[in-house]
């Protein structure tokens, strides 16, 4: 099974069917999710529930006589979690223009931080299990301030931003910008650089935001060593640091086993007084995300774009989840 070292929520490749300048691709996944945070007597949700997602992706493109390419993408997605059924909805569109190694996107952009290699797991869901298990494995997710960076939204409208991407040889550079309407406009600026040499990729990204607690800097080093994959990552999330170590190995020709461990530092007490959430251990009202999280994931390739996926994750707040199911792409 080929290890994917650049899997992000925006860029996971799938097979597609081409018709003129329109391509349709997608995937489905469904399975069981055990989550010990649920309790029918407390929140009305069973500990074991069905989790599922069906996604259709539409890519349209046209190219001028001079070689300038124009493209657009949108998705339709139906998702159910915690046994709550969900209907299908279209997301916001992304438009792009590219020429040789340059690309400009507008609308529902990818985002520089989101596009950084070495931050998501090398699994089909980019996380643990069949739906990611809340992505505690990502060093940018701390203190219940998860996904507070610009990223392509598969189920929503996105941020309506603009981004510039340049790739040449083993180098990729990415700058993104977005602004949010409101009584006070809120801007985000992201920058990312990645370089691949041989079997190794190094990457770094930074986001500067007008919103409180959203500034962050991330770095990663990843190696694809044949049968084995190794990676380390670190992030400073506006004063809360988090590091992670990751490894995966192919077992035979059809199986892959992955493990990870991350550790999150405590929030500064002055930030809590200023209104930030509290992740510290042994503090009343804390989300208790300080400390270590770990997980293990197993994948078995069934052929034809289908695989069995199973994983266990223990979060730093002592939440346990186990998931198993089927993932198939088309």
Which residues fall in each region the model found?
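Outer-membrane beta-barrel proteins
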Residues: 2-330
């Amino acid at each position: 099974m080929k290890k994917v070292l650049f899997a992000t929520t925006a860029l996971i490749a799938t097979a597609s069917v081409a018709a003129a300048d329109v391509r349709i691709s997608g995937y489905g996944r469904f399975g069981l999710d055990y989550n010990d945070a649920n309790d029918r007597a407390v929140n009305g949700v069973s500990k074991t529930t069905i989790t599922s997602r069906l996604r259709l992706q539409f890519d349209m493109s046209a190219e001028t006589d001079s070689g300038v390419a124009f493209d657009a993408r949108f998705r339709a997605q139906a998702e159910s979690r915690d046994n709550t059924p969900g209907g299908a909805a279209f997301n916001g569109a992304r438009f792009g223009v590219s020429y040789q190694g340059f690309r400009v996107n507008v609308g529902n952009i990818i985002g520089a931080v989101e596009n950084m290699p070495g931050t998501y797991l090398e699994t089909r869901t980019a996380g643990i299990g069949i739906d990611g298990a809340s992505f505690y494995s990502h060093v940018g997710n701390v203190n219940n301030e998860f996904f507070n960076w610009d990223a392509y939204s598969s189920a929503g409208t996105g941020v309506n931003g603009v981004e510039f991407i340049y790739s040449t040889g083993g180098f990729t550079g990415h700058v993104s910008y977005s602004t949010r309407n409101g009584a006070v406009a809120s801007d985000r600026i992201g920058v990312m650089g990645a370089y691949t040499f041989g079997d190794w990729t190094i990457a770094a990204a930074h986001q500067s935001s007008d919103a409180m607690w959203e500034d962050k800097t991330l770095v990663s080093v990843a190696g694809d060593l044949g049968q084995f994959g190794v990676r380390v990552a670190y992030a400073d999330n506006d004063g809360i640091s988090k590091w992670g170590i990751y490894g995966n190995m192919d077992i035979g020709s059809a199986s892959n086993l992955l493990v990870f461990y991350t550790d999150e530092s405590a929030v500064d007490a002055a930030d809590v007084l200023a209104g930030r959430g509290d992740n510290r251990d042994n503090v009343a009202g804390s989300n208790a995300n300080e400390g270590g999280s770990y997980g293990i994931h197993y994948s078995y390739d069934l052929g034809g774009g289908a695989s069995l996926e199973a994983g266990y994750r223990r979060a730093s707040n002592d939440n346990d989840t186990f998931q198993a199911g089927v993932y198939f792409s088309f």
